[in-house]
Amino acid sequence: MESSPTSRYIIVAEKASVARAIKDALKSINGEFTVTNVSGHLLDLDLPDEYRNWWAVKPESIIRLRRLNHVIRDEESYQRLKRIFMENNGVLVIATDNDHEGELIGSEILSLYRSIRGEDAPFKRMRFNSTAKSELLESWGRLEDDLNWRWVEKARLRQAFDLITGAAFTRLLTLSTKRRNKNVNLISWGSCQIPTLYFVVKREKEIMSFKPTKYWYLRATLETAKGEKFTAYSQHLYEQKVAEELHSRAVNNNIATVKTFRTSLKTQYRPLPSRTDDVLRDLARLTRIAASKLLSMMETLYSEGYISYPRTDTNKYPQNFRFDAGLKATIEGGIVRERTERPPRPRQGKLDDGAHPPIFPVAPYMGSGILRKIWEYIAKRFYANAYCDDAEIAGQDAEIMIGDVELRARGSYVSSPGFYSVFDYFKPSENRLPQLTPGQSLRIVSVELVEDETKPPPRLSESELLREMEKNNIGTDATRASFPTLIAERGYVERKSGVYIPTMLGQTLIDSLELTDSRLVTPATRRTIEEVMNAIERGELKYSDALDNAAKIYEDLLIKCLGDIDNVAKKLSEAFQKSGDQRPKRRYRRYR
């Protein structure tokens, strides 16, 4: 977009650092630019004033609400923008993040702008995926004439739905329990946080109900003529007498014989381009830092110009993607020593959210600490995906006979490192067997009879919990990371040694609601709501119809819960009494 000397623009970004980057990028362009920013949402939804008194309003009337109030959420930004719009006559350019929430924030800015300048006041939409100067200049050259109103409506639906359902259920549970126990502060309910908690409780139940089964096996240490030692094992045996008999037949031998030896090669594919969910799962596993904090740090790297936009569900590069900038950042950031001569050949995924490319490095980050670790992961994954070969793993399988007793030895090693030479985070450990040949004799060093028992499944780590949430369509790539932290803040779970353990309160909440109706806690109900929201984005549903459809599903469940609330409240009150300092602090908003 060419700017004449008399062109005037008011550019509003979503973050101060992004505003600074835009201001710097546009220095070489003719025109008068007022560049400012908000700090997230300008406005928020709230219940009408007559619904403020928790004790005076029936919960079922809240979930039927369709007339909601817009309230100022960021007073400082609101007043600053209002003053700028009144004092400047430039054309508004909305430069918020290029996603659903960014679009909704853009509509809030536009609403304030047109309330001052008139309903026909002109505006433009600026879209970009990184704050690199070259991309911002390109973005300025292709300003759009309108917002994506389907994105706005989808984000608005999520906001309204979460408010009316969360407020209705939270008030019902809190007030009913408080009648029995005055010390109760808040029993928070949200259609995403409850299924997230359900996964943790479900796993805990599997662990607690697990009944171990004893088994036995033979473990033989063997040695080749060259002095190479390795271990072979029998299959698991569930009868002790059979195991003891097998051991007695094997232990009297001095020589074992190789029956078969096979080596097979398996391709280990290089990682797909980085999307939010994959990156957060890996980084949570590697750093043991909460995904919500990791995402916040990724946003810092983005807003300061080191990586592209970090909230994306895309794992395939567009055909016209320019790899040079990412490669340059990777080299200058010390990930690889010299520029490769081979052209980019990315392994492509199948997902494209239509808004952003995969996450990639934009500029070298030479700082230290967790920010450096995050940047390194993104840069290494970018290079491994686009410029490295797949790896190859050799699997070894040997059948060993000790008399008539058959044992098995398995080994593996990296036969061709490929991308592991750069992206080495999950490189498999090697357990290489010596090269064996059928008929080869081996010296038996020892044969032991080992007793063991089956183990319960492990508790969920944050990485595994995020995987469960994505698999069941709980939340989005932009919101999913917040829910594990949220249920911990509510006092429903504790995070110990990197895994989640439900508190008595959290387990009681899930158990009591599940007895009332399993749809209150299982992910299938929320998954249906996500489908309704996606229908808005596809243009198949209007906002009002979508909200009616979504709210009706939970209204029916609320009525069901009302019918059993005495039982639910009794159990929750007892859990509160026993849990003591696990009680969450009272919060009125952010029902999700």
Name each region found by the language model.
Residues 240-273, 280:
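Metal- or metallocofactor-binding catalytic centers and their adjacent structured scaffolds
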